[in-house]
Amino acid sequence: MDSSDRPSLRQRLSNWGRTDTKPAATDLTAPPNDPSENMELPPLPPVELLGYSHSTRTKIMTTELADEIRNLVPERIKLYRSWQLQYSLEQHGTSLTTLYHRNIPPHGDTARNGFVLAVKNSRGQVFGAYTDQHYHVGGKKFYGNGDCFLWKVKNADSFQAFPYTGENNFVVYCNPHFLSLGGGDGKYGLWLDDALKTGVTYPCATFGNEPLGDEKFDVVAVEVWRVGE
């Protein structure tokens, strides 16, 4: 081999460790692995319930029930630990007008809040709803978005929720005479009268729900909780 054909020292050093095998092509369209994909997020702390009076005898909400509901709310709402009691039938009186008044957010902004309605009937059945807006008279319009859902406690260890189906937009409708959630074929998913004494619950297209309790019932307790700032 002629000396002129030999690689120079600089070339030999620059080729140190190389092989004749071409490296595998890199797929530039494939995203890099996200190390957080395999990370288990820490559990959320238990919900802190604020607003019950020491003398209140009938309390619907528990930390266990609140945790079940929190599992289904939007992520931004899920992060709030404190739930504030806005209205209690026992503490504030049996009036739908009072319920509406006490639900007005302190800063007028509901974008950072969620609202949980809880009802207990005379047979001890517990059920309710989660909504993205506070309960208020909305004229002749329905309101609420796809984050809303109905829920029920079937027994001490069984919670069931009914999410928005998209079949119609009859999510929440309130007027001075009644409060309602869900609808279709002339039936409400949940309906309460203006005195908060009686109510009805039927299957409805909005949430694809079964009756949340007895279809016609007498009210024992009603609560509304604000989740957020």
From Swiss-Prot:
InterPro entries: TLDc_dom. Its main location: mitochondrion. It is found in: Mitochondrion. Keywords: Mitochondrion. The keyword Acetylation does not apply. Pfam families: TLD (PF07534). It comes from the Eukaryota. SMART domains: TLDc. May be involved in protection from oxidative damage. PANTHER family: MUSTARD, ISOFORM V (PTHR23354:SF62), NUCLEOLAR PROTEIN 7/ESTROGEN RECEPTOR COACTIVATOR-RELATED (PTHR23354). This is Oxidation resistance protein 1. The gene is OXR1.
